[in-house]
Amino acid sequence: LRGVTFKVIAHGYCSPFYRNDILIAHGNMKCYFQTVMNKKPNRLSGSGLLSFYERWAGAFSKNIWAVSNKVKSEWNELYNINSHKIKVVRNFINLAQFDYTDVNEAEYVTFVGRLEKGKGIDDLYYICKNLPDTSFHLVSSIPAPQNFASLNNVLTSIAVPYAKMPEIFKKSRVLILPSYYEGYELVTIEALCCGCPVIGYNVGAIRELYAESFPGVFIANNKEDLAQVAYKLISLDNEKYYHLRQTIYSKRELFSEERYAEILTAAFNEKK
């Protein structure tokens, strides 16, 4: 097409030796591995090779769009990528799909994500076990480990269609995310846009939004603290609790497609 300029856009480590106009960084493989495994990845391991590809993808790209300020710093510090070519462009969702309609008796403490080590599965088990009078709903793409079967307060749902997720959040008293690493997880945004409070560790969207004093976002330091914060939230009387949900809901425009378009346009047009 004459007169048309095309942009080459890639994600993460998908195109390590190709000159992209924009590389979208949803996280950092090296930081993920070091955080979860508490050691550096072996260069010839799967994580080591993916980190290698990711680093070179960043080096060959003209611009990098990181989903959070933390991810931007990870690419700068761990891959030695010049911070001037990294812009922060956050995720967004369809606000019309995630709303406050039909929110009534919120009953569960809900977890959404893969039930694996990086998502804090051991901490999640500890919390479920130590709050036996609290109902938990685990929503995942894979079954829960066998030890969860002994807990009578845990309901597990596998492969829930995305269209059903708003209903999950509307029935959730609180979303709990004990992840050790996140980039800028959509599940936090989706929950907040239904007015559901979120608690987790100092990672991902929780980290960024807590720093910006976004209502309904709570940070815990460890699994004991996480259980305590969860208990305080589920123990709120209904008047205070639903006032909190309405306050959260009132700030949801931050995650709108229109807001994302503004950030996107600014990132495209910024002078180099």
Model-derived features: positions:
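Short hydrophobic beta-strand element within catalytic cores of glycosyltransferases
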Residues: P197-G200
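Membrane-proximal helix-turn-helix segments that form the acceptor-binding/catalytic region
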Residues: R43-I64
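Short alpha-helical donor nucleotide-sugar binding micro-motif in glycosyltransferases
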Residues: E167-S172
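Conserved acidic donor-binding segment of nucleotide-sugar-dependent glycosyltransferases
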Residues: G216-E224, K232-N238
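Nucleotide-activated donor-binding/catalytic signature segment of Leloir-type glycosyltransferases, i.e.
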Residues: P145-P166
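Conserved donor-binding/catalytic core segment of Leloir-type glycosyltransferases
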Residues: W65, D102-K119, Y125-L131, H137-V139
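Carbohydrate-associated surface elements
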Residues: K70, F92
